[in-house]
Amino acid sequence: MPSLWDRFSSSSSSSSLSRTPTPNQPPRSAWGSAAREEGLGRCGSLESSDCESLDSSNSGFGPEEDSAYLDGVSLPDFELLSDPEDEHLCASLMQLLQESLAQARLGSRRPARLLMPGQLVSQVGKELLRLAYSEPCGLRGALLDVCVEQGKSCHSVGQLALDPSLVPTFQLTLVLRLDSRLWPKIQGLFSSANSPFVPGFSQSLTLSTGFRVIKKKLYSSEQLLIEEC
């Protein structure tokens, strides 16, 4: 099965996507480098701060007020930090993430289709791009672990390597959440290991719009960065 990076590379064969520095080639595009230099001073402060909660159930605003608030956020300026190369790769990553969640196995009896609301897809993508911005290889250097949290339990869904040919420079752990109101519907998924396996999907479950991302640099001894959204 071709890797995510192979699929991404074949769809963008008209441009060189390598970020490995060479004497005659900068590590990123001139446009991306200029944007990075312009926003780097502000990016440093992001490594120690939590992002604002995007879950309207945890905020004092409704969906319209939340949208208006997000439109006014200027730190970081997402347009300044954007990189077309990473944005294209992120879109492919989000598609692969949704496919993995659709085949997730949360218990021993049946797998469940976990569905990401559109708002969650958008916000997770933006957060991954922001956390990858200060990395030497951008999003290509990410190793993404995906977990689903329900109550005090955290269930691993899988690990996604964006470019298997590249040594990862940082690790991201994405912790998604099931809506607590769904708990009566999913208790059967967490049966004991002795219960017989029943093939097929039990049901489709929609994830909460709240999530958490934990970033760990693999080339540095810096403390973990935890982003709560």
Swiss-Prot record:
<dbReference type="GO" id="GO:0072593">
    <property type="term" value="P:reactive oxygen species metabolic process"/>
</dbReference>
<feature type="modified residue" description="Phosphothreonine">
    <location>
        <position position="20"/>
    </location>
</feature>
<comment type="function">
    <text>Regulates cell growth, proliferation and survival via inhibition of the activity of the mammalian target of rapamycin complex 1 (mTORC1). Inhibition of mTORC1 is mediated by a pathway that involves DDIT4/REDD1, AKT1, the TSC1-TSC2 complex and the GTPase RHEB. Plays an important role in responses to cellular energy levels and cellular stress, including responses to hypoxia and DNA damage. Regulates p53/TP53-mediated apoptosis in response to DNA damage via its effect on mTORC1 activity.</text>
</comment>
<dbReference type="GO" id="GO:0071889">
    <property type="term" value="F:14-3-3 protein binding"/>
</dbReference>
<dbReference type="GO" id="GO:0071549">
    <property type="term" value="P:cellular response to dexamethasone stimulus"/>
</dbReference>
<dbReference type="GO" id="GO:0005829">
    <property type="term" value="C:cytosol"/>
</dbReference>
<comment type="similarity">
    <text>Belongs to the DDIT4 family.</text>
</comment>
<keyword id="KW-0832">Ubl conjugation</keyword>
<dbReference type="GO" id="GO:0035556">
    <property type="term" value="P:intracellular signal transduction"/>
</dbReference>
<dbReference type="GO" id="GO:0032984">
    <property type="term" value="P:protein-containing complex disassembly"/>
</dbReference>
<protein>
    <recommendedName>
        <fullName>DNA damage-inducible transcript 4 protein</fullName>
    </recommendedName>
</protein>
<dbReference type="Pfam" id="PF07809">
    <property type="entry name" value="RTP801_C"/>
</dbReference>
<dbReference type="GO" id="GO:0032007">
    <property type="term" value="P:negative regulation of TOR signaling"/>
</dbReference>
<dbReference type="GO" id="GO:0001666">
    <property type="term" value="P:response to hypoxia"/>
</dbReference>
<dbReference type="GO" id="GO:0005737">
    <property type="term" value="C:cytoplasm"/>
</dbReference>
<keyword id="KW-0597">Phosphoprotein</keyword>
<keyword id="KW-0051">Antiviral defense</keyword>
<keyword id="KW-0053">Apoptosis</keyword>
<dbReference type="GO" id="GO:0051607">
    <property type="term" value="P:defense response to virus"/>
</dbReference>
<feature type="compositionally biased region" description="Low complexity">
    <location>
        <begin position="9"/>
        <end position="18"/>
    </location>
</feature>
<dbReference type="GO" id="GO:0007420">
    <property type="term" value="P:brain development"/>
</dbReference>
<comment type="subunit">
    <text>Monomer. Interacts with BTRC. Identified in a complex with CUL4A, DDB1 and BTRC. Interacts with TXNIP; this inhibits the proteasomal degradation of DDIT4.</text>
</comment>
<dbReference type="GO" id="GO:0006915">
    <property type="term" value="P:apoptotic process"/>
</dbReference>
<dbReference type="GO" id="GO:0042771">
    <property type="term" value="P:intrinsic apoptotic signaling pathway in response to DNA damage by p53 class mediator"/>
</dbReference>
<dbReference type="InterPro" id="IPR012918">
    <property type="entry name" value="RTP801-like"/>
</dbReference>
<feature type="modified residue" description="Phosphothreonine">
    <location>
        <position position="22"/>
    </location>
</feature>
<feature type="modified residue" description="Phosphoserine">
    <location>
        <position position="16"/>
    </location>
</feature>
<keyword id="KW-0496">Mitochondrion</keyword>
<dbReference type="GO" id="GO:0030182">
    <property type="term" value="P:neuron differentiation"/>
</dbReference>
<dbReference type="GO" id="GO:0048011">
    <property type="term" value="P:neurotrophin TRK receptor signaling pathway"/>
</dbReference>
<keyword id="KW-0963">Cytoplasm</keyword>
<feature type="region of interest" description="Disordered">
    <location>
        <begin position="1"/>
        <end position="66"/>
    </location>
</feature>
<dbReference type="InterPro" id="IPR038281">
    <property type="entry name" value="RTP801-like_C_sf"/>
</dbReference>
<dbReference type="GO" id="GO:0005739">
    <property type="term" value="C:mitochondrion"/>
</dbReference>
<dbReference type="GO" id="GO:0001764">
    <property type="term" value="P:neuron migration"/>
</dbReference>
<dbReference type="GO" id="GO:0045820">
    <property type="term" value="P:negative regulation of glycolytic process"/>
</dbReference>
